[in-house]
Structures are given as structure tokens and as C-alpha cells.
């Protein structure tokens, strides 16, 4: 698949099969994150944690359910893996942009490998300052200086989505000057 095909084919999947992702696929996906542009080349300000089995992902889901008070919530929709990007400077806009670039690369790599994906930020961010924060950090085995920013849920989609046509968006315009 070429870059534009991957971009068009990538959709947010919210219904995954409950099975593990092959380690080699996860390694390729993480490798794509490492090619992402990062402001001022501060790669050392970022950390990636891979919850690589459905059992580990289920632990995250349990923490998220406890945090939001909904025993049925599933912010990762049964994904087989969750790849969390953390930063040393979580309150800086650049750190969010860096994490977003890494996550987008991973979402596109997952698509290229025939896997489904979903950008998950809200449930990750909700853990900050919460009663579940210590348990979440322990699950991630996260060094103290890092704070989770966002994540990519990855898995086998129960249904394959057709590539999208170019979206028409009345809110955002494109102006070519000159």
C-alpha cells in the first residue's frame, strides 16, 4: 500500500476481535513511530509503552472503567494491543504534537499491515491526577519523569472498512495563495 492509500484506508475502528497482535507487527508499528518528526529532535523526551496482549489491554480498560465510573465502558473497543506515548513535558503543546505525530505514524503503519486502529487520548489523559493514576503508571512500568499523553489502540477489525473517499468538510477551507 502506498502512503496515500494508507491515509485513505485508515479509519477509526471501534469493534476489534479479541486476539493478540503478532510481535513482529507491533515492532513494525512502533518502528513507524520512531520515524515521526519531533520538535527540536527531542526524542529523549518521549517514551513508548506497548501493552501487547489482550490481557494487558484489559487491565487498562478496567482502570478506565473505574476512573469514569462506567462498568461497561471500553475506550479501546477490545483492541489486541495499546501503544501509549508518554512525555517528559506533558503540559507543553509541542509534546502533544510530538506524541500525535508518533501516533499517526503508528495508525498508518497498522493500516498498512492490514490491522485496524483507533487514536485514544481521552481515557489516557483522564488518568492524570486520578485515583487510578498510580495503577496506570505501574501497568505501564513508566519511569517517573514521564506522563502518558495519548495512545494507539491496534487490533484485528471485526469488519474491514472500505477506503474512504476524500472527505468534504464545510467547516475547514483550503486557500491557495499565489
Task: Give the label of every model feature segment.
Residues 1-81, 174-178:
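N-terminal amphipathic, basic helical "cap/leader" segment at the start of enzyme domains
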Residues 5-6, 12-13, 17-18, 142-178:
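C-terminal helix-cap and adjacent tail motif
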Residues 33, 91-136:
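Small-aliphatic-rich amphipathic alpha-helix that forms the alpha element of a beta-alpha
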Residues 40-43, 74-77, 140-146, 165-167:
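Solvent-exposed alpha-helices and their adjacent loops that cap or buttress functional pockets
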Residues 53-58, 89-91, 158:
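Short, charged/polar surface micro-motifs in flexible loops or helix N-caps
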Residues 65-66, 133-150:
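Short, conserved aromatic-histidine micro-motifs
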Residues 66-104, 108:
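Helix-adjacent hinge/juxtasegments
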Residues 80-83, 116-118, 150:
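Structural motif
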Amino acid at each position: 500500500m502506498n502512503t496515500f492509500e494508507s491515509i485513505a484506508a485508515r479509519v477509526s475502528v471501534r469493534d476489534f476481535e479479541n486476539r493478540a497482535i503478532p510481535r513482529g507487527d507491533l515492532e513494525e508499528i512502533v518502528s513507524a513511530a520512531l520515524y515521526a518528526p519531533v520538535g527540536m529532535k527531542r526524542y529523549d523526551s518521549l517514551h513508548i509503552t506497548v501493552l501487547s496482549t489482550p490481557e494487558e489491554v484489559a487491565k487498562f480498560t478496567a482502570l478506565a472503567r473505574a476512573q469514569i465510573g462506567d462498568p461497561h465502558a471500553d475506550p479501546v473497543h477490545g483492541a489486541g494491543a495499546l501503544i501509549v506515548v508518554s512525555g517528559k513535558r506533558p503540559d507543553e503543546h509541542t509534546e502533544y504534537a510530538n506524541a500525535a505525530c508518533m501516533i499517526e505514524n503508528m495508525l498508518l503503519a497498522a493500516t498498512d499491515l492490514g490491522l485496524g486502529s483507533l487514536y485514544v487520548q481521552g481515557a489516557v489523559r483522564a488518568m492524570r491526577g486520578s485515583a487510578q493514576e498510580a495503577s496506570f503508571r505501574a501497568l505501564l512500568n513508566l519511569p517517573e519523569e514521564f506522563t502518558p499523553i495519548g495512545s494507539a489502540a491496534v487490533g484485528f477489525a471485526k469488519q474491514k472498512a472500505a477506503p474512504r473517499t476524500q472527505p468534504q468538510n464545510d467547516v475547514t477551507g483550503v486557500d491557495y495563495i499565489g
